[in-house]
């Protein structure tokens, strides 16, 4: 009781780490004993009912987070009813290693405007903390990894608690914080940011094997990002093994070279105190030299094994035997596992010492499975505690059977005091941390480039140039980015007018301009620029689009991000694209050039499968227009679609357009003759729905050619040739195979639940055809993109497309080789089987 009273320092609003340390120095031995003694669960609350000590409360909450994270997983695997088909899992060991550093962050260090990406395998810890903060329900925790329950990995879109950044594909959430910091810098430089916050990633050390982290690290250095923390849970175990020794020095040098501060939190207070005693220096040297595998094995074996190994290795050195003899086996194990990442005081000291905006990486030494019987074992990643082990832990934590979910059960501080403490935690604001942003007005039409012959890529550049000339809200809120292909994707005109962004106010002189060397590029870099130039790293592109595409929610200021890249290199960043869509980030992806129509460039730069990726990606509407007027219509719609955020859908919205999403535009450098035509409301709607009749079929027509994108000229010529034999044949322009297909599936689902009058756009388009009509589909992509059209009404399909890797050649040569030329289309039309 007397030891406990030592923690009674100040009222919650007046307490501080500095006061605590002064007090601890005066009563060091008693404080040390209290810090590492088991609390008596049957004792009366030891703090007065008026205020509570900060450190004691943090340590109590830390223990509760550990228990809850274990119990959440145990309940999901052993107590909740299941079909028994699959193990539920949940990563108890990975969660345990990060309990202290997460508790220090959320219960003390973070402020409401800070944003956090939590390592995927620590999601039970995150959910437990949110539960204690009042942001998560007991029902959600009990449903962990079940339908409608707390998610296996933190999810912005699936979880009900306060997730800032989704994580799951390791490494991407880490990079996301860097690009979110860049977006915050962008908003700040443009005068739109409100209160700045830190972008924080809690990182599993095995995530540092992910290459995308270093791509992001280098890009962050180029842009001089600020207010960025990466907290490494340095438990030195990956999924399969114990990691290599001596990596930390290499990590530290790498981060230092990128302008980061590196803070290593290696020892807890117990170890620091032991080092100050006779024999302590020898102990420190032994720990520093101990291989990770040996240390992990000793952690698992426990105190007796520690004693034997230490005496064998350094027992002959001065003071060591006396130092080790001071501890019984349990205390020795506690000492040897008292790493910095498991010491609340050490973590608080490290966090609170940083008061500037320099990017900082904390390496917090931890033990995978700390505090659990799984600790240190090399097989613990997927390991689960047995029911008997969990029951022993329950008793040790003083938790009454049946009260396992109670927030403050078993803690030595009165519930009312802990509740008051939690309510006054700086991070635990009652204000919504997800912001709303007013929509950006979009003009009723976008100017269509007037060229009689152009490509969709050229048209895109001219449309953006036209927007750039207008000093309206739309132009101001567009931000563009590209991985070193700004010019070759026709963004150059936009950048000439709107400039490059860099937070530095000092501009680099254009020596070409000063030397009177002519160049089309007049790019000026400034804090007011609207183009973010990236290196050739597609992961960075998609994660930046994710961060910018969530600016309205993260920072309360809406941006309309446009990213450009070569279409085939979507594959290089596909996981990051998936990550962006999974979070419901809003952006326009312009992929150009595309297909084998990029003829001389050869197979390495030609794409065929990307339209299938667009069709398969939730939250992403994929278009492939043929003409400039179609592109203008689609781009205008896209700016509104990015901003749509309806929670519920009105009847008839088969595509969920009222909910909004992102857009993928697959464009081409192939120039084709443009069509002069009025764009009435009906045609505009059909372009957006995904298709329209360029040449309508006669009623009962027996032949249709359906084309997509740049295959329009070949399809037109083939259609002209076929109408001599089949005058009623139709020519279907597909602007979005994705939206036609999604609408068709949605209509089928609606009819299955009784909405029998529901029809899809493609069903209405194909309705005039004869039941035995033949469909010939043509696309500069895999034939499966359009071959499904035959399933709509059970009609025969001859699907033309690209199934092999491309190669260099002229357009006519490649179209003939891959059977996309006029003759091949006509031949397909003539086939009857």
Where do the PLM segments sit?
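Intrinsically disordered, low-complexity segments enriched in serine/proline and basic residues
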Residues: 4-7, 11-15, 19-21
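Glycine- and acidic
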Residues: 50-58, 80-89, 111-114, 159-167, ...
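Active-site metal-binding loops of divalent metal-dependent hydrolases
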Residues: 199, 204-207, 234, 366, ...
